[in-house]
Amino acid sequence: MTTSRRDFLKFVVAGSMSAGCPLPHSLRPVPDEPSAQIDGDHFAICHEVRDGTVFEKPPVSKRYDVIVIGGGVSGMAAAHFLRDHNFLLLEKEPHFGGNAYREEYQDQGYATGSAFDEKDTESYQLAKELGMTLLPIDCWDPSIIRGEFVEDTWHSGLDHLPYPISVRSAFKKFRTTLLEMDPEKDAAHLDSFPISDILKSYPPELTQWWDAYGPSNWGAKTQDTAALCVVEDLHFNGGEEPDVRVTLPGGNGALAGALAKSLAAMHGERMLGDATIVSVDPQKTEVNVTYFHEREAHTVAAKAVIMATPKFITARLVAGLPDEQSSAMRAFRYCPYPVVNMIFDKPVYNKAYDTWCPGNAFTDFIVADWVLQKNDKAYKQKNNILTFYAPLSERERPLLLQDESCQTIAENILRDFRKLQPAFRDAEPIEVHFYRRGHPMYLPVPGNFTKRIPTASRPMDRIFFANTDSIGPVSDISAAVVSGRRGAEWSIRRMGNSSASAERLASAVGIRV
């Protein structure tokens, strides 16, 4: 974590920009292989891993039943379901949680990424198992458009959009049209074209709204979003069912923290952070994994390995991938994603949980303690913490490499927030916490769900591919837990039946192959 003091306020920058970081400066590639340029900038080293540099691999020093690579919710869920087995969980960051990571300001939790769950999902059930009570949000999302607060955007708010009657009618028609579509029966068709093909027949105000909503929720604007995603989402957010979303301060980082705490209490010696994986090598009866920790290389082996890592890095670590599968993994696209928490010493905004603001330097913002305000009568807010989501386009990823450009992003967010409504004009945070991730969410481009994911996620003989980009159609907390559980079940079956095909075992645990 790096900390920078800024003239205009306290400005804290944190987060990881590369799935391969950090590598220690002492590493050297195998002779006669391309040299890694090690000049103090760990991003350059990470890119050597990304580009396929081969590092020296020491002999196997220890063996396990299962090695889980990736300490996000997917990897930790796999470890949780493997708790009766001899597992090792490896994570490149010093902390566990991945995109669901909770931070605090004076004991007040706030999210740095993944924000909420839904009732009765596998992740919700896991939270209950861990003794957590996720609280209902019970607040359909409003929007602030042209200075107007529009409550419950896709229900009653459609009559109050600050647009001409013709545009309001178009919003209603769009909602009605998509609610008539069946995202289950027509999944293959709806996944074959972008939602922009439908939106081009509507006024541009609809595209502007979805071009804010899409990047925040699944990393892509309308031209890169399969229609399936919007149809599914509108059935959830624009249908007649009540709001079933649940959360806690810190978002899904609360679940990640509870998982990490539970695992550490039972199996802390099997959890290793700051461990940078450089190779995953299948052998005849096991899989070798080489990683660096505290400047030293280690190779360990297991009967099965679960790759709970994004596909773009998985493809660069696992040896022997079939060409078709490697190509599918490398075809995944990921958005760069800063999340900015602004901490105020007086109330600024507490009208809704998640408010959409199309056309600004941020897409939406969340009231960090919303569910405590609404569900705990004794609760009193100490600081008003607002979490601003500001996903970038892929070409803007380099902006996150420098603190100065991160500061500019934060300043632009504050500028646009102040312009939203007169009440915000003098809003002055006492601190700004900037969390950056280079590749947190895969883009749900057409064909991703029905074609690319099944190909990319096909298990190898002793390697299972977990992570949310093994489920789809978008990245969410429930998919992380589902993929982790499936990975654990698959690994247990593999250990119990070494002769069964990987695909047969995959079908047994519900994998599309």
Regions picked out by a protein language model, each given a short descriptive name:
Residues 2-64:
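Extreme N-terminal leader/targeting segments of oxidoreductases
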Residues 30-54, 354-356, 361-362, 367-513:
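Conserved flavin/dinucleotide-binding core of flavoenzymes
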Residues 182-279, 286-288:
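Active-site/ligand-binding neighborhood in enzyme catalytic cores
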Residues 124, 128-225:
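Mobile amphipathic helical/loop "lid" adjacent to a hydrophobic cofactor/ligand pocket
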Residues 83-103:
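Glycine-rich FAD pyrophosphate-binding loop
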Residues 66-88:
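N-terminal Rossmann-like FAD-binding beta1-loop-alpha1 element of flavoenzymes
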Residues 100-120, 177-184:
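Glycine-rich active-site loop/strand segments that organize a redox cofactor
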